[in-house]
Structure formats: C-alpha cells, structure tokens
Amino acid sequence: MGLPEERVRSGSGSRGQEEAGAGGRARSWSPPPEVSRSAHVPSLQRYRELHRRSVEEPREFWGDIAKEFYWKTPCPGPFLRYNFDVTKGKIFIEWMKGATTNICYNVLDRNVHEKKLGDKVAFYWEGNEPGETTQITYHQLLVQVCQFSNVLRKQGIQKGDRVAIYMPMIPELVVAMLACARIGALHSIVFAGFSSESLCERILDSSCSLLITTDAFYRGEKLVNLKELADEALQKCQEKGFPVRCCIVVKHLGRAELGMGDSTSQSPPIKRSCPDVQISWNQGIDLWWHELMQEAGDECEPEWCDAEDPLFILYTSGSTGKPKGVVHTVGGYMLYVATTFKYVFDFHAEDVFWCTADIGWITGHSYVTYGPLANGATSVLFEGIPTYPDVNRLWSIVDKYKVTKFYTAPTAIRLLMKFGDEPVTKHSRASLQVLGTVGEPINPEAWLWYHRVVGAQRCPIVDTFWQTETGGHMLTPLPGATPMKPGSATFPFFGVAPAILNESGEELEGEAEGYLVFKQPWPGIMRTVYGNHERFETTYFKKFPGYYVTGDGCQRDQDGYYWITGRIDDMLNVSGHLLSTAEVESALVEHEAVAEAAVVGHPHPVKGECLYCFVTLCDGHTFSPKLTEELKKQIREKIGPIATPDYIQNAPGLPKTRSGKIMRRVLRKIAQNDHDLGDMSTVADPSVISHLFSHRCLTIQ
C-alpha cells in the first residue's frame, strides 16, 4: 500500500498543474520537510505502524488514548463490544460502556483547572461585519456554560431531555450546546438556513422540550428574521399536538440597546442598525437569554454520564426523504473528535485553527466546537460568508488572527477561484501551515489552486472524507506523513478498516472500484437513528451484512490511495451538503400544479453539484417562468435555500421502466445532454426521452 518515498516529488507551480490535469493520479506531493520534522506522525512508515496497531488492537490503542481524559468511574467491563452483522442479531456498538464522564468537563473544566489554560483564548469571534469582533477565554466560556446550564435546569431540563438550537454562528451557540452536554441533555442543532418547516419536523421527531434561538442576524447583505421562523415552527408544532413549553431568545441584533458591547464575555453590538426588524413576543413561552443569565449562578456540577449515553442528535438527509436523527454518544465521540483533530491537523498548542463550517453541520460540531476544545485549541468562530463585504474576507481574517490551520469546503474554494489569485496573494498568509477540505471530493483543479495560490506550495492539504454518521474523519492524509494526490482522500485514519465491495458483497483487492464500506467500528460511529433503530440497521448494515455501508462509491488506485466517486444512492451533494432527491421531489409535488417530479444532480462549477428537476404538470396547468419561481420558493420554504434548484424542466412524460419505476440514470444523461444512454431495453416509452432532450434547459458545466 502507498508510494515508495523516493518516487514522490514536490509540486512545481504550473508544471504540476499540467501533469495533474493530464497525467492524473500518478502525480503526488511530499509533505514539506519542515512540517514533517515537528509532526505528531512524521513519516508514512510511522503512520502505517500506528494504523496497523489501531486496527489489530483497537481496545489497547483507544484505551491508551482514553487515559488522557477524565473518567469519574472507569470502564467496568469489556472496552469494546459490537455486532455489524444483521444476520446474527441486533446491530450494536458499545465503547467503554459503564465508564462515566462528562464531555463538557473534559473540554472546559480540565483545561481551566488542570491544564491552567483559563486565560487562553478559546474563540476569536468575527461577526458578519468587519470590525465586529470579540474573544472569549476558556475561563469565560466555562463561567457562561455553567450559568446557562443552571438556566436550563431551572427551566426543568434534565438528563436525557432534548433541546433544539436554531442559531447563527455566535458564541452563545457554543455556550448552549456545551450547557446541554454539561447537564446530560441532548442538543439537536438545526442549521439557521433551514426553513420553519424543517425546524418543526426536527423538533417533533425528537420531542424537544425547549428551543433556543436568536432575534435575527445578517448573512452578508441578507437580513434573516430567525425569531419569526422559530415562531412559525413552534406554531406548526402546536397545530400538530406538540406544544414546546419554552423558547429562549438571544438578543443578537439588539445588543447595542442592552449596553453589552464593551464586555469581552459578550458578542459586541451589531454595527448595522435594524429599525425594521419586528420581533414578536409570546408571553409565557419566550424568555430573553440575557435576563435569565443575569439571575444564574456561575457554578454548576456536571451530570456524570455513561460513555454510551447519547450526547446529541443531528439530522441528515435520508434517501426516503424523511431526515434521519443521527445519535452520537458521550465517550466514543469525545475520543474520536479529539484524536482526529490532533493528528489530522497536526495540532500544536500555539496554533490558531479556523474551520469555516457552520455548527449546524457535523463539521461544525466536531471541528468548531468539540475537537478543538478537547485539545485546548484557540479557534476562529466566523458568522459571515466568504464574499462579504468583498472576496478578500477570508484571507484578511487569516492574517488578522494569524491562522495556522485552515479548514473549508471545495465549494468555497471554487467560488473564490473565480475571482483570480490577486485577492488571495495581496494578503500575507504567512501564518498558514496546513490547509484542509471537507464536505465533498475536491476536483484536482481546485486542489491545485488551493495548494499553489492559498498555500503558496508550502502547506500540505488534508482532503478529508467522512460523514455525519461517522462523527469524525475516516479517510485523510496526515500533514507530515502522507504524500498527497490531488482529489484523493488517501488513506484511512487510525481505527478505520475500509474495504471496497462489488455488487455481490465480495471484497476486492488491489486496484478496484465499488462500494466503500468499513469492516469494524471506530469510537465515533453513530449508535442509532433516533427513535428508529430499524432504519439504522436497514440503511447502513442490511445491504452487506458484516459491514458499515457508506453509500459512497470509491476507487482504490495502484498505490492503495482511495478516491471517492460520489453517492451510489439517491442522494445529492450540493455545496458539501447532502440532500435527498425524495425530499425535494415531495416538496415539488405538494404544489397544486405538479403531478409528478424527478430530481437529479447536475455538475456545477462552484457547488460541485446542483439540482435539475423534471416536473410533470396536472391537467389545466401551464408551464411558465412564474410557475418556476413558485416551485423554487416552495422548495426554499419546505427545505431551505440550500435546496433551491438551478434548473426546472417541463416534462410531459418521464422515462419509466415497464414496472413504472422512474429511470433517474436516463434523466441524469438528459440533464447533461449526453446521448450515450446505455441499455434502454426496459424503457416503456422511448418517445418521452427524445422530447425531453429537445426541450432541456440550457445549462452551464
């Protein structure tokens, strides 16, 4: 497995680009010697030794790492028990069951009291507007988390209760999630870009007792009245027979009138006035965050939890359309995110880390909040977007805080590539040491630009493959050890045993392409789908008994490098966010004009993939630009702006098999104007296809 070290060469600007573009996968880049010298894992040989031990002796490997954390009581029985084979009984995974700990205690109290990091900055907060900044130390964060833990307890929240959080990227979001963890309640964070319908659905699915939200926030130029959306969601919950008893509201846009701007422990006042924001108030349900915090004590004993107690629920799109509540547990998740953060980003105490992901996604949970804090890191917490107020924003923040490790999505890289090198190169970026990508496979052109322009050919790139379900990185380079190939996630992380299977479930050796699966558990694996263990078993373990099935296709090359080829199921990856085709289709057919809908992915130069929708109209309705806009609006309201389609085509008929199944592979070909359709023997009405080709939308590649 892997490349002989002597065959590996460093990249050399444009020549490297040409070779990567034409020669493709043979090209590789060695880790810079100055990175390897100080790295936790300094060579490919050392990586292989550690990986072999982690897979062959997982109990000993992770047992040693567990000793670095505080346990109220040790593990009384087996360190690991599991079953991955549905034919042998119920699927279960148990790491350190019976041991008790608290993740909030481990990431805050220990750093403040044992490691004496109380005065170290935990987060530099950078607001939407440049100049709108604050910072919060580990001690200040601990005090605020204890205060809000007491607030939650006073509201009757107990261990095992679920709390919904619907907030922008502000320090109170981190405080809220850690307070839940401190008292043993499960946080269910809903991305603030999701609609009220999506929020309602998630509150109902996990029966959340309480909602935490914000008055409003700006995303670039756009004002988002989050409280209004939260009110709509709570009204929908009430109508469906589930009244949420309490909603705690952070006054974010109204901070100036609270006089909170000078305190380092609070986010500062917004610089842009919002006289037009009307915040409705529901007496008896709504409570102001700042008023509750003023009355709360600043000490709070943590709730000691079993390692296998649930820590949080995070919803991810499911191929059936209904989102799945992914459940992660206290002990295993803590070990895994702390360890992946330390090794994948080669973290050292003086680093300033910046993950641009929103905490509403798993990347934000693992690598904005829990992973960095578990390592005592200083991070940047960014509320804004890469292009506001201009395309210099990310690089000016890198220079401002002297960011050393930078983690973002290929979508952001492709977006910024469009504006050329100058907005990047006019900033120093001298502090950068490691670059990372997450959310989707990165195309080689974007990788090369990231390496050459952003990293000035001196920063290793960690191209990380993982999922909401895995908790942390699964396939990834290590900065000081792994020769990089543009577009490859390279090799498995510690404890990860990948395999590639064919359709019959046989493991393929050497160069191969097929289904990516994992053969044994790692501590960060999800334990169940909330309230639906059967769905957990069916989705991830039924197709190939004995394996965790990712749903992704994968190639392994002659050097043993893994290349993710994309989703095999009916899922789309838009700007690094997984969307279900079924979810979008059902939002379309809810419109009175639409009889039937089919949604496929289409290549997009910035998003990676975008939505191309085919709609069959009901009798009496005509296709028009007005209808197209109505359908887009409907999807935004039902799911959120992230799911807005780029293309909607009128389809008087859809290609179907004789049994009535929509042939989505044919629709994908039509969307891309690719007439090489393959075997069409099962199509019921071939004339439908020629009509769709002749009326397809004009697309960009």
UniProtKB/Swiss-Prot annotation:
UniProt subcellular location: Cytoplasm, Cytosol; Cytoplasm; Nucleus
Chief subcellular location: cytoplasm
GO molecular function, one term: propionate-CoA ligase activity
Interaction with TFEB: annotated span: 1-107
Catalytic activity: acetate + ATP + CoA = acetyl-CoA + AMP + diphosphate; propanoate + ATP + CoA = propanoyl-CoA + AMP + diphosphate
Motif Nuclear localization signal: where in chain: 656-668
Positions bound to CoA: 219-222, 363, 575, 636
Keyword Zinc: no
GO cellular component labels: cytoplasm; cytosol; mitochondrial matrix; nucleus
Effect of mutating residue 363 to A: Loss of catalytic activity but no effect on its nuclear translocation upon glucose deprivation. Loss of ability to promote gene transcription for lysosomal biogenesis and autophagy
Record-level GO BP terms: acetate biosynthetic process; acetyl-CoA biosynthetic process; acetyl-CoA biosynthetic process from acetate; ethanol catabolic process; lipid biosynthetic process; long-term memory; propionate biosynthetic process
Pfam families given in the database record: ACAS_N, AMP-binding, AMP-binding_C
Enzyme Commission numbers on file: 6.2.1.1, 6.2.1.17
Ranges for region Disordered: 1-41
InterPro entries in the record: Ac_CoA_lig, ACAS_N, AMP-bd_C, AMP-bd_C_sf, AMP-binding_CS, AMP-dep_synth/lig_dom, ANL_N_sf
Notes on how activity is controlled: Inhibited by acetylation at Lys-661 and activated by deacetylation mediated by the deacetylases SIRT1 and SIRT3.
Domain of life: Eukaryota
Phosphoserine found at: 28, 30, 36, 263, 265, 267, 659
Residues engaged in binding ATP: 439-441, 463-468, 552, 567
SUPFAM superfamilies tied to this protein: Acetyl-CoA synthetase-like
Keywords tagged on the record: Acetylation, Activator, ATP-binding, Cytoplasm, Ligase, Lipid metabolism, Nucleotide-binding, Nucleus, Phosphoprotein, Transcription, Transcription regulation
The family this protein is said to belong to: Belongs to the ATP-dependent AMP-binding enzyme family.
Subunit structure: Monomer. Interacts with TFEB. AMPK-mediated phosphorylated form at Ser-659 interacts with KPNA1; this interaction results in nuclear translocation of ACSS2. Interacts with the 'Thr-172' phosphorylated form of PRKAA2. Interacts with CREBBP.
Function statement: Catalyzes the synthesis of acetyl-CoA from short-chain fatty acids. Acetate is the preferred substrate. Can also utilize propionate with a much lower affinity. Nuclear ACSS2 promotes glucose deprivation-induced lysosomal biogenesis and autophagy, tumor cell survival and brain tumorigenesis. Glucose deprivation results in AMPK-mediated phosphorylation of ACSS2 leading to its translocation to the nucleus where it binds to TFEB and locally produces acetyl-CoA for histone acetylation in the promoter regions of TFEB target genes thereby activating their transcription.
Name of the protein in its database record: Acetyl-coenzyme A synthetase, cytoplasmic
Organism: Homo sapiens (Human)
